[in-house]
Regions:
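Internal amphipathic alpha-helical repeat/solenoid segments
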Residues: 42-85, 90-112, 117-133
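Mobile, glycine-rich extracellular loop/lid and propeptide segments
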Residues: 77-80, 99-107, 135-150, 155, ...
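C-terminal motif of bacterial Sec signal peptides marking the signal peptidase cleavage site
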Residues: 17-19
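Inward-facing hydrophobic residues that define packing positions of alpha-helical scaffold repeats
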Residues: 90, 103, 148, 164, ...
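Short glycine/serine- and small hydrophobic-enriched flexible loop segments
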Residues: 87-94, 143-154, 214-221, 286-293, ...
Length: 410
């Protein structure tokens, strides 16, 4: 018995020094809790990845021996948003070649090599890499850094790409921009919050869908650049911002807001209107889910938010709710178009993010929302509209979350 106790103690010590001290999280498999088999879950994810990255209607296209881009097919262009999302799918799915190809295309064609924007990325390009818009969108750089740090965690830095070095270089670029020549970093340093774009005009407001506090905590843990305390401060500020941006009754937020969470007025040519819940906003429920799963620093508010948001959607019918709203949950005053269509629809992208929020709450609609997502297919709508890009990527992200496969460690 004594020798057994000694062996047990040694095993416990070894465990604490090796795997048991790894700090790896356990990730909830919501689909399995609903009774779906692991084989069914894996097949569901693989079918979605096949549609977006491999099928004839795919968004992902390889170029030459070592590059690839993720196309916004409906708009026939390439965006930093899509490149960064493709990289996130790749690191989550352990597809290193795909990750490296997308990052190489991004560095080759999108990165500014000189001038005031040097080190930032043109957010909007053609399939051949020529720039449509020279400006940057802060969410692209935000995701790129996080993608690279996660890649460093998963694959190390001894391959053909030093992911940590590239992340550190981009971070140094961000914090070297001080407004000279109209270029700022992606963080408004007065509010310590992410801005809409890194320029002196767009630095004055933000987009709630850019706020993923847990990403900043990944930066704090892995960037090794001496800014860990700042990143944790931004994460905390971002959570408080979301409290203000999401309507206290409906949970709905506007696409673009002040740093106090108030909707801003958008202007397009001769038209101007107050920002509402449009396409960008679809991401917010899933972003908050990500922070809930990875960090758990604001669970009480996040659970209340998820309950409000899901109830607002379910009030229209779980299989019917539209994809754009006013903040009070009513019909939007202005319908935002996409891909040549301007109509409200029951979009799989919003269903996906709404279902992901079931991980934060357990109301009478949560399980049915996930079952409804499971029953849906990523395919063209009756009017011919099809968004394999945005709908498709949000759908994949949601499947990864709900299966316990959207992770920050492995």
């Amino acid at each position: 018995m004594k020798s057994f106790k000694v062996l047990a103690l040694c095993a416990a010590v070894l465990c604490s020094l090796v795997s048991c001290s790894s700090g790896k999280k356990e990730y909830r498999n919501y689909f399995k809790e609903l009774g779906y088999s692991q084989e069914e879950i894996d097949a569901k994810i693989q079918a979605a990845v096949h549609e977006v990255f491999e099928s004839e209607r795919r968004a992902y296209h390889e170029v030459g021996d070592d590059m690839a881009y993720v196309a916004d097919v409906k708009n026939r262009d390439v965006r930093t948003e899509g490149q960064s999302y493709g990289m996130m799918v790749a690191v989550q799915m352990d597809k290193q070649d795909m990750f490296d190809r997308i990052w190489t295309w991004t560095k080759t064609y999108m990165e500014h090599k000189e001038g005031p924007m040097k080190g930032f990325f043109a957010w909007h390009c053609r399939y051949d890499g020529t720039h449509i818009d020279e400006g940057s969108a802060s969410d692209g750089e935000f995701y790129f850094v996080t993608d690279l740090l996660l890649a460093s965690r998963r694959w190390g830095n001894d391959g053909k790409i030093n992911y940590l070095a590239d992340a550190q270089s981009l971070l140094n670029t961000m914090f070297s921009k001080d407004g000279s020549d109209g270029v700022t970093g992606i963080i408004n340093m007065d509010y310590k919050l992410i801005n809409f774009c890194p320029d002196t005009v767009s630095n004055r407001w933000t987009d709630p869908s850019y706020h993923i506090p847990a990403f900043f905590e990944v930066w704090a843990e892995s960037a090794q650049d001496g800014r860990a305390d700042l990143y944790r401060e931004i994460a905390a500020n971002s959570r408080q911002f979301l409290h203000k941006a999401c309507n206290e009754k409906t949970g709905i937020n506007a696409d673009q807001t002040t740093f106090d969470g108030k909707p801003i007025t958008r202007s397009f040519g001769q038209y101007s209107f107050v920002s509402q819940f449009w396409y960008d906003s679809w991401r917010v429920p899933m972003n908050i889910t990500l922070d809930y799963n990875w960090s758990g620093a604001d669970k009480e508010w996040q659970s209340e938010y998820a309950d409000k948001f899901q109830r607002t959607m379910a009030s229209y019918g779980i299989e019917k709710f539209p994809d754009q709203f006013n903040l009070d949950g009513g019909a939007p005053r202005t319908i935002m178009g996409a891909g040549g269509y301007r109509t409200l629809r029951h979009s799989i992208g919003l269903v996906a993010t709404t279902a992901a929020a079931s991980m934060m709450t357990d109301n009478e609609y949560s399980k049915d929302l996930v079952r409804h997502l499971w029953s849906m297919k990523l395919e063209p709508y009756e009017d011919g509209y099809y968004d394999v890009y945005y709908d498709g990527l949000l759908y994949i992200f949601s499947l990864l979350h709900l299966s316990g496969n959207y992770r920050m460690d492995w």
